[in-house]
UniProtKB/Swiss-Prot annotation:
It holds the Pfam family ATP-cone. GO terms for molecular function: ATP binding; DNA binding; zinc ion binding. This is Transcriptional repressor NrdR. It comes from the Bacteria. InterPro entries: ATP-cone_dom, NrdR-like_N, RNR_NrdR-like. Belongs to the NrdR family. Keywords: ATP-binding, DNA-binding, Metal-binding, Nucleotide-binding, Repressor, Transcription, Transcription regulation, Zinc, Zinc-finger. It comes from Erythrobacter litoralis (strain HTCC2594). Residues 49-139 form the ATP-cone domain. A zinc finger (unnamed) spans 3-34. The gene is nrdR. NCBIfam families: transcriptional regulator NrdR. The keyword Repeat does not apply. GO terms for biological process: negative regulation of DNA-templated transcription. The keyword Cytoplasm does not apply.
Length: 153
C-alpha cells in the first residue's frame, strides 16, 4: 500500500482487526521508508452499482459521499462514528445486494432517512431538509410536527 506521507510503495501491516460490525478490516500500517503510521480499511465490494440521479445523470456509488452526508447531518449531535459507520455499511450492503446494477438516488435517500430516524431525530430532520429541499421555515415546522406525532405513537 502506498504511503500517504511520502508516496513510497511499501508498507507493513502492524495490526489488523475487524471493524464496522465485522463488515470491514481495519489495518494499522507503517511505511518502510519514512516510518509514518496510517490506518486503512478493507471492505468487501459485491458489485459495482450505478446511482441514477433525479436529473437522470448516472455516477458510480460512492461510499465516502454517503458517509459524508450522514456525518454532516449528525454533526454536534452526539452520534458516534461507530453508529455512522454501521448505518453507512448497512446501506451499502442493501445497495450492493439488491441484485440490480442501478439504484435511484431517491431510494438511497430513503434508506438514510430510515436509519437516521432510529438514531437521532435532529439528524433525521437535518438530512430531510436537504434531501426534501425545504425552502421555508414552514417546511421544517410541518416535518418536525410529523416526526413528533410519529414519536408519540
Amino acid at each position: 500500500m502506498r504511503c500517504p506521507f511520502c508516496a513510497h510503495d511499501d508498507s507493513q501491516v502492524k495490526d489488523s482487526r475487524p471493524a464496522e460490525d465485522n463488515a470491514a478490516i481495519r489495518r494499522r500500517r507503517q511505511c518502510s521508508k519514512c516510518g509514518a503510521r496510517f490506518t486503512t480499511f478493507e471492505r468487501v465490494q459485491l458489485r459495482d452499482v450505478t446511482v441514477v440521479k433525479s436529473d437522470d445523470k448516472r455516477e458510480a456509488f460512492d461510499r465516502s459521499k454517503l458517509e459524508q452526508s450522514v456525518t454532516l447531518a449528525c454533526r454536534k449531535r452526539g452520534v458516534t462514528q461507530e453508529q455512522i459507520d454501521q448505518l453507512v455499511s448497512g446501506i451499502q450492503r442493501q445497495v450492493e445486494t439488491a441484485g440490480e446494477g442501478e439504484i435511484a438516488s431517491t431510494r438511497i435517500g430513503e434508506m438514510v432517512m430510515d436509519g437516521l430516524r432510529q438514531i437521532d431525530s435532529v439528524a433525521y430532520i437535518r438530512f430531510a431538509s436537504v434531501y426534501r429541499d425545504f425552502s421555508e421555515a414552514r417546511d421544517f415546522e410541518e416535518f418536525a410536527s410529523t416526526v413528533q406525532e410519529a414519536a408519540k405513537d
